[in-house]
């Protein structure tokens, strides 16, 4: 199988994940190489927030390391969500959880010089949705839910402990623990809301 065929096959199987990855990488290249001022427009300013920044901040990253860390989690958990909910469900989860995380981050430090950015809140939402969509009466899916649930629980506990200790700093930047937890809560609420919608006859 040629490399081009393999890439085309991957894109056809998970178009939502790869479109999100492409946008995140394109935005980072644009903000670091061609339009540095664009980052300030897209990232969430806590001092003077703009409504669109609660969405666009989920597509902006501070560094390549920051981007690759989130891209890896998006690739793994995003594909899980897309397998269960489709490309639209993945995009909805990414955006809704990104907004939830950014709102939580803003409320934790309103009207300050803080700037929130990164896909971490969306990724934590994908963590939660990815696990909850596996919780079904099926041995294989339940095993997946247990393994993934243990990982997600560990991440949430680490975020909670970090908040309790006053937060952490990486590379001179404060980690958005409130955004992470907000994204996870957004994911849980999204699944609960969707589970209450009436099912189609064939579902």
Region annotations inferred by a language model:
Residues 1-203:
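A detector for small-residue-rich transmembrane helices and their helix-helix packing motifs
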């Amino acid at each position: 199988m040629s490399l081009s065929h393999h890439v085309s096959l991957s894109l056809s199987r998970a178009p939502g994940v790869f479109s999100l990855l492409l946008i995140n990488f394109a935005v980072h290249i644009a903000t670091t190489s061609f339009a540095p001022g664009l980052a300030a427009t897209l990232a969430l300013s806590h001092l003077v927030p703009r409504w669109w920044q609660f969405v666009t901040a989920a597509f902006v990253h501070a560094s390549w390391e920051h981007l690759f860390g989130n891209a890896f989690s998006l690739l793994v958990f995003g594909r899980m969500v897309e397998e269960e909910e489709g490309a639209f469900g993945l995009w909805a989860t990414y955006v809704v959880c990104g907004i939830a995380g950014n709102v939580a981050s803003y409320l934790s430090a309103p009207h300050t010089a803080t700037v929130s950015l990164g896909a971490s809140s969306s990724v934590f939402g994908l963590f939660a949705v990815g696990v909850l969509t596996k919780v079904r009466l099926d041995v294989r899916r339940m095993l997946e839910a247990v393994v993934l649930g243990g990982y997600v629980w560990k991440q949430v506990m680490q975020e909670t402990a970090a908040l309790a200790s006053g937060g952490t700093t990486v590379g001179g930047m404060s980690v958005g623990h409130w955004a992470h937890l907000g994204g996870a809560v957004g994911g849980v609420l999204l699944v609960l809301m969707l589970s209450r919608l009436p099912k189609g006859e064939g579902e």
